[in-house]
Design a protein with these regions (language model features):
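Secretory-pathway ectodomains
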Residues: 1-428
Length: 428
């Protein structure tokens, strides 16, 4: 793909766009004027991409999943048409073009539209539920598509193993460690179904936390099954509804209708601090800070050690990437597109307003967020949202695509206007 550098787009060059009808109170401008002018000129000047490097056929109901250099297409079951579900695997070559040949296909009789696909070690996992039963996980051999095992529950990576969470009925939930190759259970623990959360590391879950309304919190090692700590964090108090989330070294407990936040050390369950915020939805690491996100939008950046609010932003509701002291944040946009900006992580100051893009896919630490937006004449701009550089770089302009795109560190996949999907390798 050709690389077109737009240069820096700074906050001070982003006045309110004209002729935009008023929306909700407080909704600011989202598209920097300089970026808009540059993209308009690119629509006529940038070279149109050649036909798709690779193509695969697909129905309108087919869902695609990228994993490194593999592509998986999941076709849900269609009972009225007499079709069962199907999973198809493709390998995406490093070079070349044209239609891809499937590596393998395997039937999925109960596959649904909400199922998901993930790869762990040498197995492909299809996870989801059906209207008449609990969630299930089905494992296939990555190389051949041969069925390895099937079991109930939600599934997540945990180092070399997998964790499954089974809920439902009157019984407590059960978290089990499963061998990815065989599906055999190594160990399991019973936990409260409505009060079990997990701490996520780059290689998967490493802590299981049960924090029921009684206040008796238990923490397990998700790799060994050993119980690490048990403590009553509300001694002498009556049971009160709470929800919790683990972020790095902290266990964050939210009470009083999502207004009071208490932080504990996850290792010792020692109380660190307590603050009051408005209607907290969830938390996430923001570099050295802790970010809290509101149920109705907006975010707070908190000092991890004290809980003090370092800064607040009302426009943004999600952080996608933090890198080199800068954060890529997402806010409300229009249609399938969201607004994006780069903030200084320490102060919340806007470094660059990147305008509106459709961004999807995974964002590994060494990867890069990729956005798409309509150009004209059935074309799409493809751009890298450069966090460290504080700018947007248009990588290419694709023709004959309708959107429904996703990207990982190396590949971009979009639905083609003529049917099926196109796959492109991203420029460096």
């Amino acid at each position: 793909m050709a690389l077109i550098d737009l240069g820096d787009v700074r906050e001070e060059s982003a006045p309110e766009p004209g002729r935009r009808p008023p929306r909700t109170v407080g909704r600011p401008a989202r598209v920097a004027a300089a970026l808009v002018l540059t993209l308009v000129s690119l629509a006529g000047a940038a070279p149109v991409a050649a036909p798709s490097s690779f193509t695969v056929p697909a129905r309108p109901t087919t869902t695609a999943f990228l994993s490194d250099d593999r592509l998986f297409l999941l076709d849900p079951a269609d009972a009225p048409a007499g079709r069962g579900g199907q999973l198809t695997a493709y390998a995406v070559p490093a070079a070349g073009d044209g239609p891809l040949t499937p590596l393998w296909r395997t039937p999925l009789p109960a596959a649904g539209a909400d199922d998901a696909v993930l790869v762990h070690r040498d197995v492909v996992l299809v996870t989801g539920g059906s209207s008449d039963g609990p969630p299930r996980a089905v494992a296939f051999d990555l190389g051949t598509g041969r069925l390895r095992w099937e079991r109930p529950g939600h599934v997540a990576p945990a180092g070399n193993a997998l964790l499954t969470l089974e809920t439902g009925g009157e019984e407590p939930a059960r978290v089990s460690s499963v061998d990815p190759a065989t599906g055999r259970v190594g160990w399991s623990v019973a936990t409260p179904a409505d009060a079990t959360t997990f701490r996520i590391r780059p290689d998967g879950v490493d802590r299981i936390v049960a924090s029921p309304s009684s206040g008796q919190v238990e923490v397990w090692d998700a790799r060994s099954g050993a119980r690490l700590r048990s403590a009553d964090i509300h001694p002498g108090e009556l049971p009160n509804y709470q929800r919790s989330q683990s972020v790095d070294e902290l266990l964050l407990v939210v009470r009083d209708t999502a207004a009071r936040v208490t932080a504990y050390g996850l290792d010792e369950l020692d109380r660190r601090w307590e603050i009051r915020l408005g209607l907290v939805a969830y938390f996430a690491a923001c570099g050295p800070l802790l970010c809290a996100y509101g149920q109705t939008g907006g975010m707070w950046a908190l000092d991890r050690a004290t809980g003090d609010v370092r800064w607040r932003a009302t426009r943004w509701h999600e952080t996608l990437v933090e890198r080199e002291g800068r954060m890529l944040v997402r806010g409300p946009g229009s249609g399938a597109q969201d607004s994006f900006a780069i903030l200084d992580a320490a102060t919340g100051r806007a470094v660059a307003d990147l305008g509106t893009w459709e961004v999807s896919g995974r964002y590994p630490a060494d990867g890069r967020p990729i956005g798409v937006r309509p150009a004209d004449d059935d074309r799409l701009f493809v751009a890298e949202l450069d966090v460290a550089g504080g700018r947007t770089r248009v990588l290419d302009v694709l023709s004959g695509v309708t959107g429904d795109c996703q990207a990982d560190a190396r590949l971009l996949l979009c639905r083609r206007s003529g049917g099926g999907f196109g796959i492109w390798r991203l420029a460096g």
